[in-house]
Regions:
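An N-terminal hydrophobic leader/cap segment in hydrolases
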Residues: 13-86
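A short loop-to-beta-strand scaffold at the N-terminal edge of the catalytic core in hydrolase folds
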Residues: 89-100
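Serine-hydrolase catalytic-loop signature spanning alpha/beta hydrolases and amidase-signature enzymes
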Residues: 114-124, 136
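Conserved alpha/beta-hydrolase
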Residues: 126-148
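Alpha/beta-hydrolase fold nucleophile elbow
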Residues: 173-184
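Hydrolases whose catalytic domains are alpha/beta-hydrolase-1, hotdog thioesterase
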Residues: 189-190
Length: 190
């Protein structure tokens, strides 16, 4: 009797261990696919999405929006941006592009991109702010663009980075007015 109880416990432990291993493996694959640079940000995935989108029925609104985003990204790529780096001693440095207006201004817009995006994709907004005569700072969030981090933090650590950028501007330009503009996962209330 004791022998069969011991066997049942052993079998249950083996099954539980295997189930846990499968669960952890699936979780790790999902995490790496959705939150790493090689996941949804990879060229393979973006090419697959583009091919899939090409097969879908035309949507005038989406086509117009995509065209505007592409125009903004093209504008951004042709700007003379100043590369800003906040060096960190014990963690990855922060990176951003700064586009200065034609005439000096004390207004700074921090334009923050969203999930699987980049500062260039915020060009649609940066262009308008630049035309209005504002300084535009476009940070690369963690796991995106110039960022040193390999994984996306879905805004959790990025919120602290935004505070760093605000402090960066305020320390150098105490009279500045700072406006935050973000899409997707950023600027969520704490």
């Amino acid at each position: 009797m004791a022998n069969t109880t011991g066997k049942k416990i052993k079998d249950a432990a083996i099954i539980g261990g295997c189930a846990s291993l499968i669960y952890l493996t699936i979780g790790d694959i999902s995490y790496r696919l959705s939150l790493s640079r090689g996941g949804l940000n990879s060229k393979l995935i973006t090419d697959m999405v583009a091919k899939s989108a090409a097969k879908k029925p035309k949507n005038e609104y989406k086509e117009k929006l995509d065209s505007m985003i592409d125009d903004g990204a093209d504008w951004f790529m042709h700007q003379d941006t100043e590369k800003i780096i906040i060096e960190k001693k014990h963690r990855q440095s922060l990176y951003a592009d700064l586009i200065r207006p034609d005439k000096p201004s004390n207004v700074y817009i921090i334009c923050i991109h969203g999930y699987t995006s980049s500062p260039a994709n915020m060009g649609i907004y940066a262009k308008k702010y630049h035309e209005l005569g504002y300084n535009v700072l476009l940070p690369s969030l963690r796991g995106h663009g110039d960022s040193e981090q390999d994984f996306i933090t879905m805004g959790w650590n990025d919120r602290l980075d935004v505070i760093e950028w605000i402090n960066y501007i305020a320390e150098r330009h105490p009279e500045s007015k700072i406006i935050l503009h973000g899409v997707s996962m950023v600027l969520q209330p704490p």
